[in-house]
Amino acid sequence: MANESAVILRSDRVSGKMEMRKNLLLQHIYRSGSIGRLELGRDLQMSKSRLCEVVQEMIDEGLILESLDGTERRGRRPVPLSPNPDHGCFVGLDFEAKRMRVVVVDFSGKTLFQRHQELRPMKDQKRLISRLLGFVDKGIDAARKLGAHILGVGVAAPGVINQTTGTLVHYDFIEAARNTPLRELVENHTGHPCVVDNNIRCYALTEWTYGAAKN
């Protein structure tokens, strides 16, 4: 039994390291848009054998694509790696004091659907929750009509966020938002995993990934 437990623990550690490597590669591929194996390995200081192992698993899982860039060069042409847009999609809700926005983006980050709506000040938490979840539904419905597999829901919320619980703790400009368990509410309502973070951090991450800050 002890030997079996040790094998399981080692297996879990190996699996955890692989997931970390895949996340690291995927993040770098997102920031690059499209990048060859050689450059990727050099940037991340990863051995060729390790890189090939991780990349192949990501291709097999449908996370990334590998395709010829079509340029004419001597010798073997580079084969860029890029996120696979058909792997699935994410529904995103972004709101603040006076407005809210819902988007659907594919796995490569391309916007497939977007809607804006006014959000009026309110003191009733149940009413606020109903408005927010109803707007999330618009994104869910749009994704389903597109035939896209929904991987999860992201919420960019204003104010103080408890990232551990996904709770909006406090926001000065929406009284009804105090101690709203956004992650729990969204997951129970949609049946999809949800991540909640402060909207300013989300904007900064987007700029770091796709904007001028990536350089």
Regions found by a protein language model. Give the residues of each.
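Extreme N-terminal segment that seeds HTH/winged-HTH DNA-binding domains in transcriptional regulators
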Residues: 1-42
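Basic amphipathic alpha-helical segments that dock to polyanions
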Residues: 29, 40, 51-64
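Gly/Thr-rich phosphate-binding beta-strand-loop-beta motif of the actin/hexokinase/Hsp70
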Residues: 77-114
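Conserved phosphate-binding catalytic cores of ATP/NTP-utilizing and phosphoryl-transfer enzymes
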Residues: 66-90, 194-215
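Short helix-capping/turn signature of helix-turn-helix
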Residues: 31-32, 108, 174, 210
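Glycine-rich phosphate-binding loop and adjoining helix at the ATP-binding site
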Residues: 116-215
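Short beta-strand(s) of the beta-wing in winged-helix/HTH DNA-binding folds
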Residues: 36, 65-66, 71, 162
